[in-house]
């Protein structure tokens, strides 16, 4: 079972998308400085059961379903992503899974496949000294799948503020 604790409609977490963001519990990463340590616990409601109704309610106003975490039941995550895709919504996963900092874009597919090949995927544990996605020094990376090249492209720079 995959559980979610709460939900929100967000506009910045996935560039160019209006996302239904779902905070997934049972996070295995336990990052120091985590802004949501309660998500480490196995708490919340059954997402697989509730997702059809959530998509019925919010589907016309969103373009993406964002899973903030992947929980501990990858089969349920895949089924939830599949349901969103069948409704013609994009999918995104934020994971604390670390990947090599010098990874080539063509190798990102290997790691994304572990998360059922979402349209967007954010990799990387939160490291306070490096900052989150908005920091140019972050270890975190956000990728978007490009169906034309059949590769994930690094879009992390879209989170960085432009100098004024």
Over which residues does each language-model region extend?
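N-terminal [4Fe-4S]-dependent radical SAM core
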Residues: 1-23, 28, 32, 36-42, ...
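Residues that form or immediately flank small-molecule/cofactor binding pockets and catalytic motifs
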Residues: 9, 126, 147
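Short, flexible, glycine/charge-rich loop motifs used to bind or transfer phosphoryl groups or to couple energy/partner
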Residues: 11, 54-56, 109-112, 131-132
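Short, acidic Gly/Pro/Ser/Thr-rich loop/turn segments
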Residues: 29-32, 128, 150-152
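Core AdoMet radical
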Residues: 35-48, 60-74, 89-105, 115, ...
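A general structural detector for well-ordered alpha-helical segments in enzyme core domains, enriched
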Residues: 50-54, 76-81, 110-114
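Alpha-helix C-terminal capping segments
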Residues: 55-59, 84
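P-loop/Walker A phosphate-binding loop and immediately adjacent motor/lid segment at beta-alpha junctions
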Residues: 73-81, 85, 131-164
